[in-house]
């Protein structure tokens, strides 16, 4: 599954990035506790103690909210940068099959992401015991949830890297996939509201039922987990990014194993994706710019002009992104 020779090669190739990722992920959680404690001590120095509370609340934005970033960087270094630099062909020429190569890259990154954050969780837990704050909110839920979400982000970018031929394409594809459910649902609904002059929530029994459905659908959008609003919901909500992680892993594994490497430098390794994706980009451009044009002046003329601009912009962006090969 994971070959030791490949593991050593990945370690030597990406040693600095791996060590920096480990350092950040290990320290992020305990540093959040230390920062809260120092803020409390600063309050005691400036004000009466009765106005100072030592409360650790993970629902307030803190450093671990960006723990997904190292996972993205690792995935780009493991696949996108290898393709952009032209070293992927050398790796594929080694006496290992593609399954071993992908599994080694994927599980090395996964191991770094999960184990580093578990160590950080343990250190933060020890600091809480030492500092003994008055209240601690969402510590376990947030710490474990961030591990799941950062692993999902890593899996998503790895899947994008297995489909694409350079680092830029990998990042753009990953970002597009992260917002794709929103684009598929929200843009058509918004345009229907403009065309028919009605609000979609009016067909629901109550505004509450509409907003409840919208909230539930947003849980299917990977990028929605970047902010920590999921903390106030059920802990079982984290099953969704966990399932997404496995789905992205399967997509990445199958794509890396089956797709040709001869198209390194191109946007997609599988050229049959070029045209459908270009059409999709143009459609999203038309719908998105159309809405922007309409809401700028609340006029149909603005809506039509926006759609025209969106079609042109979508065509050129997709053409120069997808059909122009990046030099490797």
Curated annotation (Swiss-Prot):
One Pfam family here: ABC2_membrane_2
Domain of life where this protein originates: Bacteria
Gene Ontology MF term list: ABC-type transporter activity
Induction: Negatively regulated by YtrA.
Subcellular location: Cell membrane
Single GO cellular component term: plasma membrane
Residues spanning the membrane: 16-36, 60-80, 110-130, 144-164, 167-187, 236-256, 277-297, 300-320
Signal peptide: none
Membrane topology: Multi-pass membrane protein
Keywords, alphabetical: Cell membrane, Membrane, Transmembrane, Transmembrane helix, Transport
Function: Part of the ABC transporter complex YtrBCDEF that plays a role in acetoin utilization during stationary phase and sporulation.
Entry's family note: Belongs to the ABC-5 integral membrane protein family.
Matches recorded under PANTHER family: ABC TRANSPORTER PERMEASE YTRC-RELATED
Quaternary structure and interacting proteins, as annotated: The complex is composed of 2 ATP-binding proteins (YtrB and YtrE), 2 transmembrane proteins (YtrC and YtrD) and a solute-binding protein (YtrF).
Entry protein name: Probable ABC transporter permease YtrC
């Amino acid at each position: 599954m994971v070959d030791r020779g490949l593991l050593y090669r990945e370690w030597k190739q990406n040693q600095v990035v791996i060590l920096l990722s480990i350092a950040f992920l290990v320290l992020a959680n305990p540093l959040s506790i230390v920062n809260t404690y120092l803020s409390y001590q600063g309050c005691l120095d400036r004000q009466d103690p009765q106005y100072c509370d030592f409360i650790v609340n993970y629902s307030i934005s803190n450093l671990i909210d960006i723990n997904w970033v190292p996972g993205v960087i690792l995935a780009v270094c493991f696949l996108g940068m290898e393709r952009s630099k032209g070293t992927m062909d050398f790796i594929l020429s080694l006496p290992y099959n593609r399954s071993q190569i992908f599994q080694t890259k994927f599980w090395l990154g996964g191991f770094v992401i999960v184990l580093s954050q578990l160590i950080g969780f343990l250190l933060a837990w020890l600091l809480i015991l030492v500092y003994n704050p008055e209240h601690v909110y969402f510590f376990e839920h947030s710490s474990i949830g961030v591990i799941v979400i950062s692993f999902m982000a890593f899996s998503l970018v790895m899947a994008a890297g297995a489909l694409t031929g350079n680092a830029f394409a990998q990042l753009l594809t990953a970002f597009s996939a992260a917002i794709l459910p929103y684009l598929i649902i929200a843009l058509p609904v918004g345009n229907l509201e403009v065309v028919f002059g009605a609000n979609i929530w009016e067909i629901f029994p109550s505004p509450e039922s509409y907003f409840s459905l919208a909230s539930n659908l947003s849980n299917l959008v990977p990028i929605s987990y970047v902010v920590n609003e999921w903390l106030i919901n059920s802990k079982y909500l984290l099953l969704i990014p966990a399932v997404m992680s496995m789905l992205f892993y399967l997509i990445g594994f199958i794509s890396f194993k089956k797709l040709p490497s001869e198209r390194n430098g191109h946007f997609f390794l599988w050229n049959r994706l070029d045209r459908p994706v270009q059409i999709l980009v143009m459609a999203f451009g038309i719908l998105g710019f159309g809405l922007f044009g309409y809401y700028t002046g609340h006029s149909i003329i603005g809506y039509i002009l926006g759609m025209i601009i969106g079609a042109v912009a979508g065509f050129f962006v997709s053409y120069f992104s997808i059909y122009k090969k990046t030099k490797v």
